[in-house]
């Protein structure tokens, strides 16, 4: 039977998005590039097969799943494996199959702790186990429009209005400047250069989208922590005061702009 893991808190043991993908790819010999690709459920099914041979029917897993109903079928296989091995964790299938970063990142953080608690180090050939199949890339969803908060952080009737200072770095969608040697005009030369630049732009856009999702994910957690601190601000708890100090700390020389002040000259894009 499996060793259950109930801790879901953020600790120093949690892996970053990049480290998590590296662990998955190395363990299962895959080439995942985004956390969102875990929404198919096939990765978890194979990890269960690695941890507890025979706990899941691996031939029922659709490693090339591209549609939501196929993802759901994979998670049903995973749920059956959890039940067989006595795993108490409830799988939020309806959220995971939507392919959103935050839901999938939270679940894989828990699963990594579960894996570490149960892995005995035995040899496992992941490619042979899945008969050479590779996980299909998840269709790229349109990037959501980031809604600006209607009220600044710290607004409320129970506590003074304060904001968590967030230093933002302007992200340019321009590709990095590269020295392009001038060549004599030849047939197709311009098309090749244009295609290469377009590819670079697309890669940068995907990187920006990933960074924005990750930023919003951790920003939401900081916001929740701030609300809890504000609700208990009247208490003389040294730990609470220390948390508040960390939340509102700024880098040396950083100044929070006054509301209503004319904006400074900004870089034009």
From Swiss-Prot:
Principal place of residence: cytoplasm
One protein family per Pfam: CH
This protein's UniProt keywords: Cell cycle, Cell division, Cytoplasm, Cytoskeleton, Golgi apparatus, Microtubule, Mitosis
Segments traversing the membrane: none
Subcellular location: Cytoplasm, Cytoskeleton; Cytoplasm, Cytoskeleton, Microtubule organizing center, Centrosome; Golgi apparatus; Cytoplasm, Cytoskeleton, Spindle
Biological process, per Gene Ontology: attachment of mitotic spindle microtubules to kinetochore; cell division; establishment of mitotic spindle orientation; negative regulation of microtubule polymerization; protein localization to astral microtubule; protein localization to microtubule
Signal peptide from the UniProt entry: none
Keyword Glycoprotein: no
Superkingdom of origin organism: Eukaryota
Region (Disordered) location: 168-190
One MF annotation (Gene Ontology) recorded for this entry: microtubule plus-end binding
Gene Ontology, cellular component aspect: centrosome; cortical microtubule cytoskeleton; Golgi apparatus; microtubule; mitotic spindle pole
UniProt-listed InterPro entries: CH_dom, CH_dom_sf, EB1_C, EB1_C_sf, MAPRE
Function: Plus-end tracking protein (+TIP) that binds to the plus-end of microtubules and regulates the dynamics of the microtubule cytoskeleton. Promotes cytoplasmic microtubule nucleation and elongation. Involved in mitotic spindle positioning by stabilizing microtubules and promoting dynamic connection between astral microtubules and the cortex during mitotic chromosome segregation.
Name of the protein this chain belongs to: Microtubule-associated protein RP/EB family member 1
Organism this protein belongs to: Xenopus tropicalis
